Amino acid sequence: MQVNPNPNKLSVELNRTSLYLGLLLVFVLGILFSSYFFN
């Protein structure tokens, strides 16, 4: 583990994490809305 990580790599990892969280949020909302409309 590096003591001083590359800030560019860190920002890319943060963007990737936020992207995955956004996709997960859209996926969960899609399931909730589909179950609400088809029920």
Curated annotation (Swiss-Prot):
Record's bilayer topology term: Single-pass membrane protein
Main location: membrane
Organism domain of life: Bacteria
TM region positions: 18-38
Keywords (A to Z) from UniProt: Membrane, Photosynthesis, Photosystem II, Reaction center, Thylakoid, Transmembrane, Transmembrane helix
GO biological process: photosynthesis
Localization per Swiss-Prot or TrEMBL: Cellular thylakoid membrane
Gene Ontology cellular-component annotations: photosystem II reaction center; plasma membrane-derived thylakoid membrane
Family according to the record: Belongs to the PsbL family.
Function: One of the components of the core complex of photosystem II (PSII). PSII is a light-driven water:plastoquinone oxidoreductase that uses light energy to abstract electrons from H(2)O, generating O(2) and a proton gradient subsequently used for ATP formation. It consists of a core antenna complex that captures photons, and an electron transfer chain that converts photonic excitation into a charge separation. This subunit is found at the monomer-monomer interface and is required for correct PSII assembly and/or dimerization.
Self-association and partners: PSII is composed of 1 copy each of membrane proteins PsbA, PsbB, PsbC, PsbD, PsbE, PsbF, PsbH, PsbI, PsbJ, PsbK, PsbL, PsbM, PsbT, PsbX, PsbY, Psb30/Ycf12, peripheral proteins PsbO, CyanoQ (PsbQ), PsbU, PsbV and a large number of cofactors. It forms dimeric complexes.
Protein name (Swiss-Prot/TrEMBL): Photosystem II reaction center protein L
Organism field: Prochlorococcus marinus (strain SARG / CCMP1375 / SS120)
